[in-house]
Amino acid sequence: MATTVQLSDQSLRQLETLAIHTAHLIQPHGLVVVLQEPDLTISQISANCTGILGRSPEDLLGRTLGEVFDSFQIDPIQSRLTAGQISSLNPSKLWARVMGDDFVIFDGVFHRNSDGLLVCELEPAYTSDNLPFLGFYHMANAALNRLRQQANLRDFYDVIVEEVRRMTGFDRVMLYRFDENNHGDVIAEDKRDDMEPYLGLHYPESDIPQPARRLFIHNPIRVIPDVYGVAVPLTPAVNPSTNRAVDLTESILRSAYHCHLTYLKNMGVGASLTISLIKDGHLWGLIACHHQTPKVIPFELRKACEFFGRVVFSNISAQEDTETFDYRVQLAEHEAVLLDKMTTAADFVEGLTNHPDRLLGLTGSQGAAICFGEKLILVGETPDEKAVQYLLQWLENREVQDVFFTSSLSQIYPDAVNFKSVASGLLAIPIARHNFLLWFRPEVLQTVNWGGDPNHAYEATQEDGKIELHPRQSFDLWKEIVRLQSLPWQSVEIQSALALKKAIVNLILRQAEELAQLARNLERSNADLKKFAYIASHDLQEPLNQVSNYVQLLEMRYSEALDEDAKDFIDFAVTGVSLMQTLIDDILTYAKVDTQYAQLTFTDVQEVVDKALANLKQRIEESGAEIEVGSMPAVMADQIQLMQVFQNLIANGIKFAGDKSPKIKIWGDRQEDAWVFAVQDNGIGIDPQFFERIFVIFQRLHTRDEYKGTGMGLAICKKIIEGHQGQIWLESNPGEGSTFYFSIPIGN
């Protein structure tokens, strides 16, 4: 005895893995024959052959099709099969003698399944009650002509169901469309007046599970003439060639899954006809026809309905495109404006944020977020910045490729409940790693009318340890208030977002190429300048030395003949030459910093400071400077360049002491992943407004009469420290001395 048990998610997942295409059961009104080629030997046949042909399966198995039907009927079929013209066979009119002089005429349809087996399906040929053979197609064309006269989709849908019902004579015809959650929605209906309406009702995804949907794509027309007919097995159940059940995916007569038959019975349906509406390889919807009693559908009428369905859906697509055209034009205008603004702005982020109405209008959103580099900019109605940061981390973990969108974010990201009023819907496009554009939509409360309680679409019973699913028995109106959902994202909105992504990526690539070309040009120019500076420095040294030597020789040889003014002039010349030599030496040093890679070695900084102090010994003694050096670490650095930095900073501390006796402190501290060194003096100090200027080559804050120098010392220091992947900065105020800091990364 079967007992009712609690329905679990695992039980429902059975619906997603059903192998209904290999069930070896067929509908009882026709015959299925599996044939072995080339002789068309019968290897399997449905067990109802006894009632239809008057011959048992045992009698027919192993015989050829030509022995069942006259050979003059089968020979042309074999010829076409040999020629690869199987589609031209369908349908083939075949007749067979059943008893005495009685004959049965069949519509024969042939196909090869996934295993390459030839399957022949035979249905008794029926004539329509009120139409000749070719009348079906004339009727379909008349229906299409009426459809072409409709101005909008709503009327178009209504005419579809009216015409299909007129063509088929079914009690009820519904146009059934799947939404973004795969639930079904009855968007049009034509029925007998005494029947309860289903128009506007929703049906849960489990009513038509994925295996069934895949079969609807393979079988654009599906007929069940008698819901109460007892399914018939194939004999034998396993094909002798493949040793497994026959794949009946393409079969017309394949029996429906027992759950679906129970579902139809619970709805009071005796016969059904289903026409698939397929768009871009996906099941867009169905034209579902129901009759309260069994109903035979002639083969010709089915083909006319299939033809009608294909043409109708091409018209639905065209109508949908027409009705969304104005909206697409509006979105395209937003996109064009944004592209223009991004191109002319300093960067694309500025181009987007300066025109929030365009950015939001592009996808019909109320809020947006731009995450690019270190920037996170919120536009319109959005979650707070911290919530958006967490959401971005979640998106990165999902490894979104092109686009991510949902109208119910909280179902997959529970924290979204906290900001449902602004972001129940999310559309996200990754621009590059760690960079996203997000659009948000608020929660919109909706009332959905279901055909029965969607939370109890199935019941489960258990018998002998086996769980069976049974569809619900009630299809009464069941209202649900849907929360935590936004309006769904339309396809044109998603395409607009992707178009913007493409524009941004192209813009970034173009700017990157321009920057790369600029960098190449700068590198070439810098190389030329460095080469010029290096050569010029060497070439200028010799004539300057000659000038200095000859001027000093002139003073020595003719000193007695020179008056005081002449001696002063000679001193000025010697001093000028000396200054020029110092400047050339500094230029040469600056050029070497760029042209020679730092020779990193494990360096004792204490020894480096001692060498710098030794080089400055004379200046220290002359100025009476007090030098205090703290404990120093060892680092990876270029010893000579590091000595130049300390020597320049100490020399500046002595030079810019003003009227005071110089006091200089030197120390080093470990800070996170770097050593930070400091040189502190008690000199004249520097106004903070000049902090950047002093590191620029040839920039001076004082005249040469006040303080001697070339204005290159700090520029050289900056170049050296940056070559070590470090930074240099200072703290100072006028009259309060200066402290220069520079960092060298640990493990440099």
Curated annotation (Swiss-Prot):
Domain Histidine kinase: 535-748
InterPro entries (alphabetical): GAF, GAF-like_dom_sf, HATPase_C_sf, His_kinase_dom, HisK_dim/P_dom, HisK_dim/P_sf, PAS, PAS-like_dom_sf
Claim: ATP-binding is one of the keywords in the record: yes
Catalytic activity: ATP + protein L-histidine = ADP + protein N-phospho-L-histidine
Region (Chromophore binding domain): 87-510
Main EC class the enzyme belongs to: transferase
Residues in GAF domain copies: 152-320
EC number: 2.7.13.3
Pfam families: GAF, HATPase_c, HisKA, PAS_2, PHY
Function field: Regulatory photoreceptor which exists in two forms that are reversibly interconvertible by light: the R form that absorbs maximally in the red region of the spectrum and the FR form that absorbs maximally in the far-red region. Also has a slight blue shift for the far-red maximum. Forms a two-component system with the Rrcp1 response regulator.
Similarity section: In the N-terminal section; belongs to the phytochrome family.
Alphabetized PANTHER family for the sequence: PAC DOMAIN-CONTAINING PROTEIN, PHYTOCHROME-LIKE PROTEIN CPH1
Further remark: The R form exhibits both ATP-dependent autophosphorylation and phosphotransfer to Rcp1 activities. Unlike the higher plants where Pfr is thought to be the active form.
Protein name: Phytochrome-like protein Cph1
Protein's organism: Synechocystis sp. (strain ATCC 27184 / PCC 6803 / Kazusa)
Gene name as annotated: cph1
